[in-house]
Amino acid sequence: MAPQAPDRDKALDLALAQIDKNFGKGSVMRLGEGVRQPIAVIPTGSIALDVALGIGGLPRGRVIEIYGPESSGKTTVALHAVANAQANGGIAAFIDAEHALDPDYAAKLGVDTDALLVSQPDTGEQALEITDMLIRSGALDIVVIDSVAALVPRAEIEGEMGDSHVGLQARLMSQALRKITGAMNNSGTTVIFINQLREKIGVMFGSPETTTGGKALKFYASVRLDIRRIETLKDGTDAVGNRTRVKVVKNKVAPPFKQAEFDILYGQGISKEGSLIDMGVEHGFIRKSGSWYTYEGDQLGQGKENARKFLLENTDIRDEIEKKIKEKLGIGADVTATDEAPADF
C-alpha cells in the first residue's frame, strides 16, 4: 500500500534535504520554484542573428556548433562572439587545431589578442583535454575550437599514411562531450565548435551534406548554425565582402529554423551598420525610397554603402537606431528576461 500524502511529502523533503547536503544546494529543484536563472547571452556581432537566435545572442554555458562551406564566415562569427565576451570583461580561449588563426584579422574584429588564450594542440585528445581543463577552471567565458575536422586522434597521427581508423574521431568527440557538458553548465562557459561539411556517398534523396566528427555534437549542441555565402558585395567592380545567410538549424533555448542575413566585409568582419540598416528598414525605423535611406528626416545616403558610411561617422544616430530596434524586439546586451530552458542534453 502506498504511503499517505503527508508521509510522502515528508519523505520527499527528507530526501531532498539529504541530496542538498551531499551534492550541494540546487542539485534537485522544482521547476516552478523560481530559482532558475535567466539565460545569459554573448552577442554575435550581428543584430539580425541575435534576433534569429531568439534570446539576443549565443547562450552561455552551452555547446554551439557553427558549420558551413569553406570561406563562408564561420570563424568570423566565432571571433565576433569572442570580442563581445571580452568587451564585457570576459576571458576567452581559442583552440587553433587548424593552426590558421590570423591575429591581425582577429584584432580588426575587436578581439583583444593580448588577452586571448591560444592553443595549437598536436592531437585531438590534447585539444579536448585542454578545453576540459579550461572549462573546469571556472574562469573562462567562451572557448572556440577551430575546427572539429582538425581534431585528429593520436592513433591516426602516430600511424602510417593510409591506415584505416574508422570511427576514432567520432568516439573521441562523444567521450569529450560527455565530460565537458556538465562542467560547462556549472561554469557558464560557452564552447563553440567550428565544423566543416562533407558529402555522403550514394545519397539519392535529401541533402548529401553532413558534418564531421560523428553524431554526438549534433545531440549535445544547444544551438547549431548553418552559415552560407549567398552573394558577393561589390564596390564598382571590386569585391568588398560577402552577403551571408545563417540558418538556426537547432535551438534548445528558443524556436528554431529562423534565418538571418548580414554583410561580412573583407578585413572588417560583420558590418554592424549594415545590419542596423537592414533591420531598421524591416521594422520601419529607416525609410527607403528608391535608393535613398532616411531616418526621421535625416538623409543617411544614396545606396546602402553610403548609408553605412554615414552611420559609421555618426555614431549617435547609429546608437539611437540600435536602441530602438533592441527595445522593439526585446533584445540587448542584458537580455536575461527569458526563463532558463532545461538543459536537455
UniProtKB/Swiss-Prot annotation:
Binding locations of ATP: 68-75
InterPro entries: AAA+_ATPase (IPR003593), DNA_recomb/repair_RecA (IPR013765), DNA_recomb/repair_RecA_CS (IPR020584), P-loop_NTPase (IPR027417), RecA-like_C (IPR049261), RecA-like_N (IPR049428), RecA_ATP-bd (IPR020588), RecA_C_sf (IPR023400)
Cellular component, GO, one term: cytosol
Gene3D superfamilies in alphabetical order: P-loop containing nucleotide triphosphate hydrolases
Subcellular location: Cytoplasm
NCBIfam families named among the record's database cross-references: tigrfam_recA
Role, per record: Can catalyze the hydrolysis of ATP in the presence of single-stranded DNA, the ATP-dependent uptake of single-stranded DNA by duplex DNA, and the ATP-dependent hybridization of homologous single-stranded DNAs. It interacts with LexA causing its activation and leading to its autocatalytic cleavage.
Protein name: Protein RecA
Organism, scientific name: Rhodococcus erythropolis (strain PR4 / NBRC 100887)
